[in-house]
């Protein structure tokens, strides 16, 4: 099957969140399963710099008028992969050649022409489905998140016109980000007037790229079974729950997985010493990773102090006010906190102040550093993910893989991947972390105290850590589920 993945970012070339990890790992898993998978990316500077052997494929006209842009093709080499990924890149410097964040300007405001920048991404996908590259035409286009949300819309109308028979799949990675644009921007999109309707892209008088993907795609997926159920409720549906209930029959929740070539404590080059736990032993490397990390971050070098880590965007969604509110308990119990992330200015400042007040117990690094992220998981004891909502979450999966036990709220993909340390689940060998239910300080505080209590029982801690590290989370299983969804999309498209 010829499958085109359409994404705004891809690890290791460009990453602002978990979308990039999926976009980098899923094509490789599909290729390993015998599928012909390629990717389509916008020509951001980091992407152009990372794609090798770029060569012109074709030129095409923008949906908004006479402007023409180039499509180039090349290879993305991924460490440990059996073969490179074939990548199409949209060559449009006027839209994509901007420094820093790919979506926002220096003042953290979305670029005013984002509707054009990402309409072009979906438009190029639809052009490929109509033969833009004479040598390769996708049978299925898989569009990821709002940035690629117009691809299914363009394909729908191209099929109506008899220009293609390509099927479409749309994946929601985070429903909170919907690609909302002013109604007058619809004229730039090159879609027929009926598309700007409640049964289409129209959302409270505005244009929603997310809604376009949800309405027009042949099949829908999201990144965990629990999140697939949650987004059909008013509480988690962000105003789109009615549409999602209507399309619930074509919606599938497929858990993200961990790329073992990138996230593997036994082979991770970012760690001072590797470690693994096939039988609960061979863990000396983790103790050394913790000691080196404490020294590197200026924390007190205490092996007995449980080290809590937080690798996250600093936003309200991530439950960081719970972490701030519980920090006194964490420190009073003898713990340490190491944070890596960036986001809302108020949260950044609040964490900086706590680090300044207790520099030997709290480390805060604002920004993102992939190497440091690996080192935090390698040296950490507990990974904090107390989210208000979490579509899937990769952070807790990295924590599981590296034996940094996740402390999470029972929501979305967190509920699907972490088993609480209840007496029953510890006895059965299923427990892998600490789970709380209510999004409040009291419930979070109880989970914190349970983590400290287990840490004091070293044999039990080692058993739970072993459970966590052995938890299967492979892309081969996820790829098989996606392939079945692609088959369903082809059937819906009539091919």
UniProtKB/Swiss-Prot annotation:
Listed GO CC annotations: cytosol
Pfam family for this entry, one: Glycos_transf_1
Top-level taxon in the UniProt lineage: Bacteria
Listed Gene3D superfamilies: Glycogen Phosphorylase B
Positions of disulphide bridges: none
InterPro entries found in the cross-reference section: Glyco_trans_1, GS/SS, Starch_synth_cat_dom
Swiss-Prot/TrEMBL catalytic activity: [(1->4)-alpha-D-glucosyl](n) + ADP-alpha-D-glucose = [(1->4)-alpha-D-glucosyl](n+1) + ADP + H(+)
Keywords (A to Z) from UniProt: Glycogen biosynthesis, Glycosyltransferase, Transferase
Single GO MF descriptor: alpha-1,4-glucan glucosyltransferase (UDP-glucose donor) activity
Binding sites annotated in the UniProt record for ADP-alpha-D-glucose: 15
One example of a Gene Ontology biological process annotation: glycogen biosynthetic process
EC number(s) from the headed UniProt entry: 2.4.1.21
Pathway as given in its UniProt record: Glycan biosynthesis; glycogen biosynthesis
TM region(s), chain numbering: none
Function: Synthesizes alpha-1,4-glucan chains using ADP-glucose.
NCBIfam families: glgA, PRK00654.1-2
Family: Belongs to the glycosyltransferase 1 family. Bacterial/plant glycogen synthase subfamily.
Protein name: Glycogen synthase
Species of provenance: Variovorax paradoxus (strain S110)
Organism taxonomic ancestry: Bacteria, Pseudomonadati, Pseudomonadota, Betaproteobacteria, Burkholderiales
């Amino acid at each position: 099957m010829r499958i085109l993945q359409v994404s705004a970012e891809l690890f290791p070339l460009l990453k602002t969140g978990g979308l990039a990890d999926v976009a980098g790992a899923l094509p490789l898993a599909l290729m390993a399963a015998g599928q012909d998978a390629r990717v389509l990316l916008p020509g951001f500077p980091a992407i152009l710099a990372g794609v090798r052997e770029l060569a012109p494929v074709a030129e095409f006209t923008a949906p908004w008028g006479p402007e023409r842009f180039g499509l180039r093709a090349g290879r993305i080499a991924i460490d440990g992969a059996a073969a490179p990924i074939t990548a199409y890149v949209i060559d449009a410097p006027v839209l994509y050649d901007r420094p820093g964040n790919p979506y926002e300007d220096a003042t953290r405001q979305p670029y005013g022409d984002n509707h054009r920048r990402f309409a072009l991404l979906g438009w190029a996908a639809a052009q490929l489905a109509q033969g833009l590259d004479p040598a390769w035409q996708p049978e299925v286009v898989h569009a990821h998140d709002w940035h690629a949300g117009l691809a299914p819309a363009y394909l729908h109308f191209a099929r109506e016109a008899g220009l293609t028979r390509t099927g479409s799949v749309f994946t929601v990675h985070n429903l909170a980000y919907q690609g909302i644009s002013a109604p007058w921007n619809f004229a730039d999109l090159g879609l027929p007037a009926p598309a700007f309707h409640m049964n289409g892209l129209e959302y409270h008088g505005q244009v929603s790229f997310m809604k376009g993907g949800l309405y027009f795609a042949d099949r829908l997926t999201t990144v965990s079974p629990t999140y697939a159920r949650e987004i059909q409720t008013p509480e988690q549906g962000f105003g789109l729950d009615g549409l999602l209930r209507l399309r619930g029959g074509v919606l599938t929740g497929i858990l993200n997985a961990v790329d073992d070539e990138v996230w593997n404590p036994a082979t991770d080059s970012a760690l001072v010493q590797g470690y693994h736990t096939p039988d609960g032993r061979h863990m000396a490397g983790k103790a050394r990773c913790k000691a080196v990390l404490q020294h590197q971050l200026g924390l007190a070098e205490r092996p007995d102090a449980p080290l809590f880590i937080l690798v996250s965007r600093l936003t309200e969604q991530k439950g960081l006010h719970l972490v701030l509110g519980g920090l006194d308990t964490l420190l009073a119990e003898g713990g340490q906190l190491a944070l890596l992330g960036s986001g809302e200015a108020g949260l950044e400042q609040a964490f900086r102040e706590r680090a300044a007040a207790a520099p030997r117990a709290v480390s805060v690094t604002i920004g993102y550093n992939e190497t440091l992220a690996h080192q935090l998981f390698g040296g950490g004891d507990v990974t904090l993910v107390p989210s208000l909502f979490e579509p899937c979450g990769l952070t807790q999966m990295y924590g599981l893989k590296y034996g940094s036990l996740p402390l999470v709220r029972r929501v979305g993909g967190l509920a699907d991947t972490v088993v609480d340390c209840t007496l029953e689940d510890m006895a059965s060998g299923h427990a892998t972390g600490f789970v709380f239910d209510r999004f409040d300080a009291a419930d979070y505080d109880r989970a914190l105290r349970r983590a400290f209590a287990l840490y004091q029982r070293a044999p039990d801690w080692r058993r739970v850590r072993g459970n966590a590290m052995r938890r299967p989370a492979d892309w081969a299983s996820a790829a098989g589920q996606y392939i079945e969804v692609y088959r369903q999309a082809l059937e819906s498209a009539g091919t």
